[in-house]
Regions:
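Short, solvent-exposed loop/edge-beta patches enriched in aromatic
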Residues: 85-87, 174-177
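A short beta-strand element within beta-rich, extracytoplasmic domains
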Residues: 176-188
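Short beta-strands within extracellular/lumenal beta-sheet-rich domains
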Residues: 160-174
C-alpha cells in the first residue's frame, strides 16, 4: 500500500481489525504520507473516492516464520474474521513459509480448522425462506422484505424513499438456537 489514493487501502493496523463502522470511501486529499491510521481504519462516509479497507494479519505472531512460534488459535482467528470480514472488509491472512519454502504442518492444520469452522458456521441458514415483516418497504417489488430470506445474493430489501430508519422481523417458525446472524448490505446500491 502507498500514500497515494487507491481503490484498496491498508486498514491502519496489522491485527486484521477493521473499524466499527468502516466506510469504503476516503477523501483523496487526506491520503498522504502522514495519514492517520485511525482514518484508514474507519474510512470516511463523506469521502470522494471508493477505497476498500483491507485487513491484514499473520497466522503467527509475526510476518516471518520462526520455529518457536505457533499459529493463532481458532478462537483468535474467528475473532479476527468477525472484526474484518464481519465488518465488510477483505481479510488478507499471511501464511509465512518455513526455511524449506513450505507451509508448516501446524499452519496448514490451523487453516483447515479455520475453513471447517467457517463452513460449519454457515452450514445451516435457519432464516432461509422464513416469513419477514418490515416497518417500511420501497414501493418496488424488487425490494420486498421477503428478499431478506430468499437465499439469493442479487436481491435486497429497501426502506421506502422517505424512511430514515426501519426494522424487520424474521419469523423462524419455531424456537431456534444460534449464535451468529449474517446481514449483508447491497453494496451495488452504495454503502449506507
Amino acid at each position: 500500500f502507498s500514500a497515494q489514493p487507491t481503490s484498496v487501502r491498508w486498514i491502519g493496523n496489522e491485527r486484521g481489525i477493521a473499524g466499527d463502522p468502516v466506510w469504503h470511501k476516503v477523501k483523496k486529499a487526506k491520503i498522504t504520507d502522514d495519514v492517520k491510521n485511525e482514518y484508514l481504519n474507519h474510512g470516511d462516509p463523506e469521502g470522494d473516492m471508493y477505497s476498500v479497507g483491507e485487513a491484514d494479519v499473520s497466522i503467527r505472531s509475526g510476518w516471518f516464520y520462526h520455529d518457536n512460534q505457533q499459529p493463532k488459535s481458532i478462537k483468535d482467528l474467528m475473532d479476527i474474521y468477525f472484526k474484518s470480514v464481519g465488518r465488510g472488509t477483505p481479510l488478507l491472512l499471511n501464511i509465512p513459509p518455513n526455511k524449506e519454502g513450505k507451509f508448516a504442518d501446524a499452519d496448514v492444520a490451523r487453516l483447515k480448522e479455520f475453513r471447517a469452522t467457517l463452513d460449519q458456521m454457515y452450514a445451516t441458514d435457519f432464516a432461509k425462506g422464513a416469513t419477514v415483516t418490515a416497518s417500511s418497504t420501497r414501493k418496488n417489488h424488487l425490494y420486498q422484505a421477503g428478499n431478506l430470506t430468499d437465499g439469493k445474493d442479487d436481491t435486497s430489501w429497501a426502506l421506502s424513499n422517505d424512511a430514515k430508519t426501519g426494522e424487520f422481523t424474521v419469523d423462524l417458525g419455531q424456537k431456534r438456537r444460534f449464535d451468529v446472524v449474517e446481514l449483508k448490505e447491497d453494496i451495488a446500491k452504495g454503502q449506507r
